[in-house]
Swiss-Prot record:
Its main location: nucleus. A zinc finger (FLYWCH-type) spans 69-135. Gene3D superfamilies: 2.20.25.240. The keyword Ribonucleoprotein does not apply. This is FLYWCH-type zinc finger-containing protein peb-1. Pfam families: FLYWCH. It comes from Caenorhabditis elegans. It is found in: Nucleus. Residues 25-42 have a biased composition (Low complexity). GO terms for cellular component: nucleus.
Length: 443
């Protein structure tokens, strides 16, 4: 009781300060009247606001004789006319013309499709059909789609209205015997349509580079745009890369006729005979070889990847120097092997060479086809080729004398290679008798 009295006195003091109660009015009857005005019963009996009341949504009933345009949940337009449904096919604003195609086009079970068309003006009036349908009209399907289209528009115009109540109100405008197949599915479709309404679509393009930047440095990390087309760089790339034709095209090598020139210019003229297409555009003036030998070697070098290029070039160069004779510089710096006896000269070896060891110089060819060339033997057997054998005959005799002293009689008779560990055969003439070298005393 004491607590209740204190609360009442405090309430009266507040009312007095606010000017709602005159001072001195402290009777119990007045206090009870004031408290009853804010009781829960009086609050619950107050009328609800207009927003909380159920709003009536008006729908238009289906009429098959009037062309009506509907919009599906996906945003596509359809024409409902005389129980048939049409999809938009062509729009021509300059002609005030719209063309519609039947929805049963290319969807018939018997393999045939409806070819009927409908035409309207741009304001969806003055509908007329072109052709005849090969199927009966489906009025109940057209009516359901027509009401669903109105539901879609009403849900977007009234976002606070309950979706279930909208579906129930729309069901009242259906004809007798026509009803929605699944009301819950329609409710979910309305909710999804409301959530997507007003939201921007996600961009299809994805960022190639993902990194976090500050707001101040945002402009510094933007990808630059190409001002010109990339095709302008193609000539520059073509100048850097040289495209060679594959060997499957069987290119031919043109070999011109040799022109008689002085000896001092012969080496330069022969080096110019090498075509750039054969050696990938490289001129080799240090290769003093004849034109047909050079072309044969170059073609075999391309066909045989195991060719020892350096040793073959050295052998061919020595053979060419022997055929042409020493140059003035080589004659001045000739080794002491020139004082050897005439019976050991190079000319003495030439008649005794077998046929397979001699180099047959063919007649000059005009066109050399790469298909006619045979690849050289592998690297392990390259020393037995005629070119290498002829080059071994041109080696200085001093080198032969130094190695021949270490050979046995059996090795000299079978003509084995002077190099230890090599199984190749060397074609030469032995000057020894019964295992005794006749030149040992001369050395």
């Amino acid at each position: 009781m004491m607590t209740t009295t204190v609360q009442k006195n405090c309430w009266r003091l507040d009312q007095t300060m606010l000017g709602l109660e005159k001072p001195g009015s402290s009777d119990i009857s007045s206090s009870s009247t004031d408290t009853s005005a804010i009781s829960p019963i009086s609050v619950s009996s107050m009328p609800l606001s207009p927003d909380k009341e159920k709003k009536k949504i008006s729908f238009v009933r289906y009429n098959p004789d009037i062309p009506q345009i509907v919009t599906s949940f996906k945003g596509y337009q359809k024409l409902m006319y005389q129980g048939y449904r049409y999809n938009i096919y062509q729009i021509a604003p300059e002609r005030n013309f719209k063309s519609w195609r039947c929805v049963c086009a290319k969807k018939m079970h018997d393999g045939q499709w409806c070819k009927c068309r409908a035409e309207t003006t741009m304001d969806n009036k003055n509908a007329c059909t072109k052709g005849s349908h090969n199927h009966p009209p489906r009025h109940h399907v057209a009516e359901i789609e027509f009401i669903k289209s109105q539901l879609y528009s009403a849900a977007l115009e009234n976002p606070d209205h309950d979706a279930g109540d909208l579906v129930n109100q729309a069901s009242m405008y259906l004809s007798d015997g026509v009803m929605f197949d699944n009301k819950e599915s329609i409710k979910k479709s309305l909710v999804v349509a409301r959530n997507k309404d007003g939201k921007p679509k996600k961009p299809r393009s994805k960022r190639m580079m993902k990194f976090e930047v500050d707001d101040d440095d945002e402009n510094e990390y933007k990808m630059p745009k190409l001002e010109t087309d990339i095709s302008c760089f193609l000539p520059f790339i073509n100048n850097m890369v040289k495209v060679e034709p594959p060997f499957s095209h069987t290119p031919t090598i043109q070999i011109p006729q040799p022109i008689p020139t002085p000896i001092q210019h012969q080496q330069q003229e022969q080096s110019n005979l090498l075509q750039p297409a054969t050696l990938n555009g490289m001129n080799n003036p240090w290769m003093g070889m004849e034109d047909h030998l050079a072309m044969i070697w170059a073609a075999n070098a391309m066909l045989n990847p195991g060719l020892d290029v350096l040793s073959t070039i050295a052998a061919l160069s020595k053979h060419q120097q022997h055929v042409q004779g020493p140059s003035p510089q080589q004659a001045a710096t000739a080794p002491t092997t020139a004082s050897l006896s005439s019976n050991l000269s190079v000319s003495s070896f030439t008649p005794q060479m077998p046929k397979e060891a001699s180099i047959a110089i063919p007649a000059p060819l005009q066109v050399l086809n790469l298909k006619d060339l045979k690849p050289l033997p592998p690297l392990a057997n390259i020393q037995t080729s005629p070119v290498i054998q002829a080059a071994n005959l041109l080696l200085p005799v001093a080198a032969l004398k130094k190695d021949s002293s270490t050979q046995t009689t059996e090795e000299i008779k079978v003509s084995q290679c002077l190099t230890s560990g090599c199984g190749c055969r060397v074609i030469r003439i032995c000057c020894c008798d019964e295992g005794v070298c006749r030149r040992t005393a001369a050395c």
